[in-house]
């Protein structure tokens, strides 16, 4: 009788722990996946969409260029101080860097170590997701673009969902924005 009670107690503890881990994972994925959309006001999104319509370099080209600084673990076009930039997070032997790719030439403009606590936390989570991935971010972005004609990729952010790596790909066409999930395993 005591064994059954002890087993039930262990089962409840294990289930509770699993539920907490699943909840935290879901919250982290939601936070990371919505970073681009929530970090920008509607005016910023409109400006970003306008500026992206004339950009000659694709996000996929930025991912390729950033490989000289490490393995790409996320990428996004963003407005920094009102100016467009292509930012790629990379991981090289456990060291994280933000690589800025010139959105006109496609060449690396600068690379800096990530030291901000929030950015570092995001980079670690993205690196964990990419460690389980069998497909690259540029492959996921390419599939998303092919399935969404005339859209441009604004960002590709990996996360773990249910223990599986996925890429949240944000796309824009004119004023129309959408986010799609692409499996990375």
Predicted regions and their residues:
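Long, terminal "pre-/pro-" and other extracytoplasmic accessory regions
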Residues: 2-185
